[in-house]
Curated annotation (Swiss-Prot):
GO molecular function: rRNA binding; structural constituent of ribosome
Family recorded in the similarity comment: Belongs to the universal ribosomal protein uS4 family.
Stored InterPro entries: Ribosomal_uS4 (IPR022801), Ribosomal_uS4_bac-type (IPR005709), Ribosomal_uS4_CS (IPR018079), Ribosomal_uS4_N (IPR001912), S4_RNA-bd (IPR002942), S4_RNA-bd_sf (IPR036986)
Pfam families: Ribosomal_S4 (PF00163), S4 (PF01479)
One Gene Ontology CC term in the entry: small ribosomal subunit
Biological source species: Corynebacterium urealyticum (strain ATCC 43042 / DSM 7109)
Coiled coil regions, renumbered to chain: none
Name of the protein described by the UniProt record: Small ribosomal subunit protein uS4
CDD domains documented for this protein: S4
SMART domains: Ribosomal_S4, S4
Gene (UniProt): rpsD
Domain S4 RNA-binding, residue spans: 91-151
Length: 201
C-alpha cells in the first residue's frame, strides 16, 4: 500500500502537530515552513478544515483514498461521525502496536507489522490497517522475539503509558484488547468536527 515517505518534520511544521513523537526539530520550530518566527497568516475556514483532515491522515499514516473510506464508514455508523472516525483509526493494528509501547512511532509500528512480526489470535498479520476487535490477542511471533528491538521494547514497557483499553504482558509482549476505545480515552490533538465539516461540503 502506498504511504507518505517524505520529510516528516516539514509536514509536522506545516500541520502544526508532532507527527513523529518527540521530534526535537519540530519542537524548536513549531510553525509552518516559510513563516518567520511565530507570525501567522489568516487562514480561510476551508484551509483550516483541510489542515485538520491532513493532520489526521499523516498522524495515522493513511492515504487519501483510504481515509475517505474510513470517513464513509464512520458516517454510516450510529453515533457521532467524528468520534467514529477517530475510533476506527485507533483500531488499526499499527496504531495498537504503537499505543502498547512496542514501537516508538506509528511509522515504526507500520514497518514492524508489514514485516510480519505479529500474530492476531494466532494468525500472522502483515497488514498495518488490519482492524482489531474487542478481546483480540496480539503476539510477537516466536521467530521475531530474538530481535534486539523487542528486547529493548520489553525493557521500556516498565515506563510505557499504555491506554486503559489495552493491556500488555511485559514477560511475553502479548497485547490484550479489552475493548475498542471511546473518544474520551484517545489522547490526540485532533478536532475531528472540522474533518466532518470538510467532507460535508
Amino acid at each position: 500500500m502506498a504511504r507518505y515517505t517524505g520529510p516528516v518534520t516539514r509536514k509536522s511544521r506545516r500541520l502544526r502537530v508532532d507527527l513523529v513523537g518527540g521530534d526535537r526539530s519540530f519542537e524548536r520550530r513549531p510553525y509552518p515552513p516559510g513563516q518567520a518566527g511565530r507570525a501567522r497568516i489568516k487562514e480561510s475556514e476551508y484551509l483550516i478544515q483541510l489542515q485538520e483532515k491532513q493532520k489526521a491522515r499523516f498522524t495515522y499514516g493513511v492515504m487519501e483514498k483510504q481515509f475517505r473510506r474510513y470517513y464513509a464508514e464512520a458516517n454510516a455508523m450510529p453515533g457521532k461521525t467524528g468520534d467514529n472516525l477517530v475510533i476506527l483509526l485507533e483500531a488499526r493494528l499499527d496504531n495498537v502496536i504503537y499505543r502498547a509501547g512496542l514501537a516508538r512511532t506509528r511509522r515504526q509500528a507500520r514497518q514492524l507489522v508489514s514485516h510480519g512480526h505479529f500474530t492476531v489470535n494466532g494468525k500472522k498479520i502483515n497488514v498495518p490497517s488490519f482492524r482489531v476487535s474487542q478481546y483480540d490477542i496480539i503476539d510477537v511471533r516466536d521467530r521475531s522475539r530474538s530481535m534486539l528491538w523487542f528486547d529493548e521494547a520489553q525493557d521500556n514497557l516498565v515506563d510505557a503509558n499504555v491506554p486503559a483499553w489495552l493491556q500488555v504482558v511485559p514477560s511475553t509482549l502479548r497485547i490484550l484488547v479489552h475493548q475498542l476505545p471511546e473518544r474520551a480515552q484517545i489522547d490526540i490533538p485532533l478536532q475531528e468536527q472540522l474533518i466532518v465539516e470538510y467532507y460535508s461540503k
